[in-house]
Amino acid sequence: MNPTVEVKVPDIGDFKNILVIEVLVKPGDTVSAEDSLVTLESDKATMDIPAPSAGVVKTISLKPGDKVSMGTLILTLEAPGAAAPAVQPASPAPAAAKLATPAPAAPGPAAAPKSDIKADIHAEVVVLGAGPGGYTAAFRAADLGKKVVLIERYPSLGGVCLNVGCIPSKALLHMAKVITEADEAAHAGITFGKPKIEIDKLRAWKDGVLGKLTKGLSGLAKQRKVKVITGRGEFTSANTIRVETAEGTKTVAFDSCIIAAGSSVAKIPGFPYEDPRIIDSTGALKLATVPKRMLIIGGGIIGLEMATVYDALGSKITVVELMDGLIPGADKDVVRPLAKRIEKRYEKILLKTKVAKIEAQKDGLKVTFEGPNGTTTDIFDAALMAVGRRPNGRELKAEAAGVTVNERGYIPVDKQQRTNVPHIYAIGDVCGEPMLAHKATHEAKIAAEVIAGHKAFFDAKTIPSVAYTDPEIAWMGLTETQAQAQGIEYDKAVFPWAASGRALATGRDEGLTKALFDKKSRRLLGAAMVGVNAGELIAEAVLALEMGADATDISLTIHPHPTLSETLFFAAEMAEGSITDLYVPKK
């Protein structure tokens, strides 16, 4: 009889309770090594757990909606030969601060002497990828006296964030806010006519914003004498990269390299992606048209931000999410005000529901749902795929340089951003979650400074997250869900924005500010906010946590009044028992 292998969730750092969004196999299925078994979902990305070896699935211990941690049994596999080793981590999981990525098992090749390298161009530092992390690394290295080459496959610097992500989405979200605020001013006696949306002008304005920023980056590169090469780069050795450019192939040699290759949109297999009515976030930001009925597949940050834009522009929105709540990375009480608002604005919000099939028809996209009410169908004019992103680590031929890339495309690094090859570093999306531009830029400066001989390493206590929805949601440090899962004793203070003079004056009092404090030390553990401009407010909480502030420190810091920023101050006063703006009965 063939041995039975227990396949368990690998090391995913300190974070627990990762959600299972799909089980991809069933008992009796034959799988090959590296076939995906289950899909897990974090804040902004999905991760698959692969089979450690070929075999036949005997039993399955998980179902969609379950929460798992390291060591949770996924399934048993009947496989020939000895039991396979545990699978390696699909990716580092998001947590209050950056999670430790698995250290490479063995060092890679050392840098070759300069005299042995034949190349068209030689640089002390090559940066592969020019997103927020890449250009920051290049500019910082140049400022520290290094000769730098920056390789980018697209014509414009800035990567996904600037060109097809953070910046264009915020431009459109701003205009969406203008539309909705004008519409909702009627309750105060100010009535505007229905807005006329000139889609071509709106698109041109958005593109103009991007143009200013990309032009600015090009200027900054020239000022620093950073050589920019436009083309697709791949490693050919531990000291060389081949770049396919419009003028031909160029070989670039380097003493040190920083990989900043980013990530790509994840897709659910089996859908007719050749149909232009199925779009991803990049397609949604092109603003080709405003569909009458739009399906958002994925109730995370990216999907809900795009839903906010298209709802304001006039689309009837349906959101479908496999889990039992929106924005899985945030606490449910923080998401609730957003959920209540969009329930009134959107056509449908389908939770615990799977998109089983999409059929391209002449009159629209016929979508089959499987959910609590059984199997249903509906017709949409467009469907936005927003189920996360995948790292680009496997697109670089990193193996030619000896760089370790795990099965999901992540490149493990240490706290100085080093890969297993000592002179090659990795930053941003490609080296682990959370996939956020501000994480990438922080890592970029660390890598550049280490290369320049500085004593730098990643020691940030938290990486804040923001959903730029309406209302916005922001959180940092430990969430309450994480604190409970880790058995941490804490005190919670929640200040409702209904008691905030500024929130009431703006007509948006549905928000709240929540702060968690360590029960013994009284230091801030985490904070979350939902409400107008929550993304602008969370930075104070980040600074407080980084500085080791406790409830007393925050409550004794004089805040301007009336502001939304004082809601964190009020939450700290609630924790201290000194608040006068609310009556809190003594315990």
What are these regions (language model features)?
Residues V125-L150, G303-A312:
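N-terminal Rossmann-like FAD-binding beta1-loop-alpha1 element of flavoenzymes
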Residues A137, A142-Y154, V160, I167, ...:
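Flexible, glycine-rich terminal cap/loop adjacent to redox cofactors
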Residues P92, K98-P113, I117-V126, F139-K146, ...:
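Glycine-rich flavin
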Residues G129-G133, P155, I297-G300, A330, ...:
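Glycine-rich Rossmann-fold phosphate-binding loop(s) that bind the pyrophosphate
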Residues V25-K26, V31-S32, A51-P52, L62-K63, ...:
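Surface-exposed strand-loop junctions at beta-sheet edges and helix termini
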Residues S32-P50, S69-A84:
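Short hydrophobic beta/alpha edge segments that flank linear recognition/processing sites
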Residues M1-T39, D48, P52-A54, K58-S61, ...:
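Acidic, low-complexity mobile loops and tails
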Residues E274-P291, T376-I451, E536, A544:
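FAD-site-proximal beta/loop scaffold in flavoenzymes
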